């Protein structure tokens, strides 16, 4: 059983992110932000964003937390914009 803290540090989450990065890399070898459509260049700038917000009550529902269709790969800055942190 996960809580949000342990989920985002889990091997399951890390493996899913690595898989999504490989799957979503285009023919030019670029990974594109699914929010602003600009290239994701720096490894530390790539965030896996859940379209349906992950909460303590749904983190263990893998149809939400580990569903590739529920995850966007986006810039750190874009993630902050989505969550109104600017």
Where are these regions (language model features)?
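Active-site-proximal or metal-binding-adjacent scaffold patches in catalytic folds
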Residues: 3-4
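Polar helix-capping/helix-linker motif
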Residues: 10-11, 61, 67, 85
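Short cysteine-rich loop/turn motifs with clustered Cys
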Residues: 14-49, 77
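Generic macromolecular interface patches on structured domains
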Residues: 30, 46, 58, 81-85
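Short Cys/His-centered divalent metal-binding micro-motifs
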Residues: 41, 68-86
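Short linker/helix segments within small regulatory modules
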Residues: 52-70
């Amino acid at each position: 059983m996960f809580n949000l803290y342990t989920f985002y540090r889990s091997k399951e989450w890390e493996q899913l992110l690595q898989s999504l990065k490989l799957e979503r890399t285009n023919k030019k070898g670029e990974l594109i932000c699914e929010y602003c459509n600009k290239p994701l260049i720096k490894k530390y700038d790539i965030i896996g964003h859940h379209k349906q917000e992950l909460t303590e009550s749904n983190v263990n529902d893998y149809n939400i937390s580990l569903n590739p269709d529920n995850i966007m790969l986006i810039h750190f800055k874009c993630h902050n914009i989505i969550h109104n942190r600017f």
